[in-house]
A protein has these predicted regions:
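Non-transmembrane alpha-helical segments in soluble domains
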Residues: 4, 29-39, 55, 59, ...
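Pocket-flanking alpha-helical
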Residues: 2, 53-57, 73-80, 224
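C-terminal lobe and pocket-closing loops
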Residues: 71-84, 95-197
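Short helix-initiation/N-cap motifs at beta->coil->alpha
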Residues: 45-60
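Extracytoplasmic/periplasmic solute-binding protein
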Residues: 1-21, 27, 63-65
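Short beta-strand and adjacent tight-turn residues that come in two discontinuous sequence segments
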Residues: 49, 67-69
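Conserved C-terminal helix/tail region of periplasmic/extracytoplasmic solute-binding proteins
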Residues: 175-229
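Glycine-centered hinge/linker elements that transmit conformational signals in sensory
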Residues: 18-48, 92
Length: 229
């Protein structure tokens, strides 16, 4: 997810909104050049990490920075309070084209064969009213973020600690904007790019010494395969 934000910060995309492959552009090359320099400072086994590895790395006291929701802080508060009180959530790094946070929206819907659609719709409308969203966000201790800016003025993020206010910049603040990873590619292609982790794999290939040209050729070949499906 954060690699998608990195691409957006440079104005880079692998596919445009019409499905045209845009792999070999100055912006994508900038991302790969930065990725190569960054990779030298990452843990040697980072490419084999699972979803919990970055949390464990940070809570162990060995790590200094991860890109993640505050689950690592929650674990540290429980298992390593001395680490938790030193953690702070802040905005994404800013690139030439701006500051972007990855957005992974979740949708609610009803089965078309449901036997009680009216009641189900009423429930969805009820739980999505601002006052109830506020209660749900508070119940999750601020972990789940509403997708709309007008719902980000809740005090829950400022009230969490230790340290006090550690989650205050977890929602978008200032000039940070949301971006869907792998956008603006058409959904059928974007879903393949995301599911197959094409952007992170490009970073790993560059970090392990592969040339930019070879990495771009590999990415193009992968995307061409998705475009034919």
């Amino acid at each position: 997810d954060w690699v998608g934000s990195l691409f957006s910060a440079y104005g880079a995309a692998l596919d445009d909104a019409k499905g045209k492959i845009t792999v070999d552009t100055p912006e994508v090359r900038q991302v790969l050049d930065y990725s190569k320099r960054l990779y030298a400072f990452l843990p040697p086994d980072v490419a084999s990490w699972d979803n919990a590895s970055n949390n464990k790395w940070l809570v162990s006291g060995k790590g200094a920075l991860i890109f993640n929701p505050p689950s690592a802080w929650v674990v540290a508060k429980r298992d390593a309070p001395d680490v938790a009180e030193k953690l702070w959530t802040h905005a994404m790094p800013k690139g030439p084209k701006g500051r972007f946070a990855p957005l992974l929206p979740r949708y609610q819907g009803l089965w078309n064969f449901s036997k009680n659609k009216s009641a189900a719709k009423s429930l969805l409308v009820h739980i999505n009213k601002p006052d109830n969203i506020r209660k749900l966000v508070a119940g999750a201790a601020g972990y789940d973020i509403p997708p709309y800016q007008k719902l980000l003025d809740y005090k829950v993020w400022d009230d969490q600690g230790p340290p006090p206010g550690t989650l205050s910049h977890y929602p978008n603040r200032g000039d940070q904007r949301n971006v869907m990873p792998c956008s603006p590619a058409p959904p059928p292609i974007a879903s393949q790019l995301y599911t197959n982790a094409i952007m992170p794999k490009m970073m790993v290939r560059i970090g392990r010494g592969e040339s930019i040209d070879k990495t771009l050729a590999w990415a193009r070949s992968e995307i061409e395969g998705y475009s034919r499906q």
